[in-house]
Amino acid sequence: MNFMKNSLFQRNLEQEREEEMPEEGGVLAVWGSPSSGKTVVSVKLAEHLAKKKRNVILILADMITPPLPYLCAPSDIEQERSLGSILAASHVTENLIKKNCMFYRKNDYLSMVGMLKGENVFTYPPYEKEQAAELLQLAAQIAPYVIVDCTSNIASDILSAVALMEADTVLRLAGCDLKSISYLSSQLPLLSDHKWDADKQLKAVSNIRQQEASS
């Protein structure tokens, strides 16, 4: 991430024009049914913002199948740090997040937070919702855009559940198959409480196969 973006030594006319544009960022949680393309959409959105020279943090919440090892080569990452190190702390701080952000060498405006290859939910001590909330709140202070790639298992994934509650906007994805319908029928009742704020959810159909689109 280009933390030096506003430095006098880094400023040029193009950046000044960019900075004149209002920032309308926030925290976006991408959530939905299994195989609905949550990670792909999250990465594409983060990549688009980074190409527009917008600082963005992509938080990859999956601890069962960490996405980072299959998203980019190790050589594309400036330093390997783990999401687990952040959540294992008794209190999350801004400095702790910065130390554990993985910087993407191909674009200074994109950094990622996620589990590393070989790590899983038992690699680090269990965390509570307080650490997850602190991570999201402080990440939003570091970068104007924060995208959380949530898992589908919100009943046991604390970070994804907190992201759905704390995010400014939730992008809810669903596929055109019976599995997605079954998933939403099962999980949406869990979000009926007002704390989930269903009104902030943007609904989209994604990962549509050719035969599904024509049917």
For every predicted segment, state its role.
Residues 52, 56-111:
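Phosphate-binding loop that captures ATP/GTP phosphates
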Residues 31, 62, 116, 151, ...:
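Anionic group-transfer/hydrolysis microenvironments
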Residues 20-68, 139:
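Walker A/P-loop phosphate-binding motif and the immediately C-terminal alpha-helix
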Residues 134, 140-141, 145, 150-215:
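Conserved catalytic-core segment of NTP-binding enzymes
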Residues 96-106, 112-154:
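Cytosolic-facing regulatory segments adjacent to core modules
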Residues 1-33:
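Extreme N-terminal, non-catalytic leader segments
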Residues 28, 57-59, 111-113, 169-171, ...:
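Hydrophobic/aromatic beta-strand patches that form the interior of the parallel beta-sheet core
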Residues 16-21, 25-27, 79-101, 178, ...:
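N-terminal regions of ATP-driven nucleic-acid and macromolecular assemblies
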